[in-house]
């Protein structure tokens, strides 16, 4: 090993993005964790390997055994194998599935959920600090409870349903969470700010998160208050006849609702500016299968970066497959940081090329090189090793080139 590789491999990590379960949720499923709980994102590659005629979401042991050889060398597959070998001394292979389950259950047996997280996340993966994306804290307030996560975790507030709003479910959710009545657009913005206030009272709020790429494209318009109010009024007053039509669900279509969603997006960013909170945004590839990628490049957000120049934007997942494009954006916009969370697992080769390229054009202080983006604590092991190995290879090459 080289000196730089030794340094990287023993270094603690800041996990910039994770979705870990609360202690209570972890304990509820404690007896069900088996070899397949190590798979994480590899489930999507299993689906891809199965082909279009396979039963969607096939999860049987027989299916995993049959398909695993086809995916073991993908980024997802390699992360699973790396973690399994490091944690249990076993390659991830069908002939070891029972032994892996036994080893995993042995590791969590007799440990509280807090001790399980300490063991896997802190001691094994050496992730000393974590930004926790609770996905929907407004709909599930328990995800904001600081006693349900390690002290080293900080939270990112998120409510994506606001940005693709077509009915009153997000409004009702905000009412329940804040205890406020929402009858006007201005009251809705006030309730959104009150929800963020509630998250801040935990003392753990570190960022605002936007994952709307899973539900819509990233192009954001600049609607007026009146345009947004028209959509709000139609959604909130769905008992009325609008254009001769009365409908309970989906009171507006996507085009009509976009004005309201974009208006709330701007309100959200303004709140980040007021509180000096960074904004984490999902760009690029989407988890799972059949995602619509043409609306997800980070370049669609350039008008937002330009308008909100004092807001720090943390752009996720290397915007893969548009990594070079993101590098140019990071070089040009002082308020944009490049984030490689999840990227090493999606495509280790391209992630290494992206990091090497970015180091040639962007100040290294603008690059976040790791985030596991996992749901279960033991999955962090493989993703941490995968990132460290990739980072080490890139730095070794730079040093060999005389830099």
Task: Tell where the protein language model's regions lie, with residue ranges.
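Metal-cofactor-binding active-site regions of metalloenzymes
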Residues: 2-266, 270, 332-335, 342-348, ...
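Long, well-ordered mid-to-C-terminal structural blocks that present hydrophobic/aromatic surfaces
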Residues: 260-333, 337
């Amino acid at each position: 090993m080289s000196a730089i590789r030794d340094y990287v491999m023993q270094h603690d990590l800041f996990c910039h993005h994770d979705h870990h379960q609360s202690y209570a949720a972890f304990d509820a499923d404690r007896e069900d964790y088996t070899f397949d709980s190590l798979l994480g994102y590899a489930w999507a590659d299993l689906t891809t390997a199965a082909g279009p005629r396979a039963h969607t979401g096939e999860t049987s042991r027989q299916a995993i055994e049959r398909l695993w050889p086809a995916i073991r060398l993908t980024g997802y597959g390699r992360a699973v194998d790396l973690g399994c070998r490091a944690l249990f001394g076993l390659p991830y292979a069908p002939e070891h599935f029972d032994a892996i389950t036994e080893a995993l259950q042995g590791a969590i047996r007799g440990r509280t959920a807090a001790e399980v997280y300490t063991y896997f996340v802190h001691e094994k993966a050496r992730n000393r600090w974590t930004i926790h994306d609770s996905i929907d804290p407004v709909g599930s307030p328990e995800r904001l409870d600081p006693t349900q996560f390690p002290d080293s975790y900080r939270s990112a507030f998120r409510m994506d349903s606001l940005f693709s709003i077509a009915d009153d479910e997000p409004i009702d959710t905000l009412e329940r969470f804040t205890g406020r009545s929402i009858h006007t657009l201005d009251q809705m913005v006030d309730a959104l700010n009150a929800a963020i206030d509630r998250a801040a009272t935990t003392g753990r709020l570190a960022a605002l998160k936007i994952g709307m790429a899973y539900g819509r494209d990233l192009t954001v318009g600049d609607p007026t208050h009146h345009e947004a109010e028209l959509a709000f009024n139609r959604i909130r007053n769905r008992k009325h006849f609008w254009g001769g039509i009365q409908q309970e669900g989906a009171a507006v279509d996507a085009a009509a609702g976009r004005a309201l969603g974009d208006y709330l997006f701007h309100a959200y960013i303004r709140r980040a500016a007021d509180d000096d909170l960074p904004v984490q945004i999902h760009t690029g590839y989407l988890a799972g299968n059949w995602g619509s990628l043409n609306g997800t490049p980070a370049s669609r957000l350039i008008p937002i970066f330009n308008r909100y120049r004092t807001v720090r934007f943390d752009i996720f997942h290397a915007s893969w497959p548009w990594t070079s494009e993101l590098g140019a954006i990071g070089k040009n916009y002082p308020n944009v940081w490049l984030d490689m969370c999840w990227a090493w697992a999606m495509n280790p080769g391209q992630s290494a090329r992206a990091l090497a390229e970015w180091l040639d054009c962007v100040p290294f202080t603008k690059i976040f090189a790791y985030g596991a983006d996992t749901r279960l604590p033991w999955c962090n092991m493989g993703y941490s090793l995968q990132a460290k190995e990739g980072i080490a290879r890139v730095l070794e090459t730079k040093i060999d080139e005389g830099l």
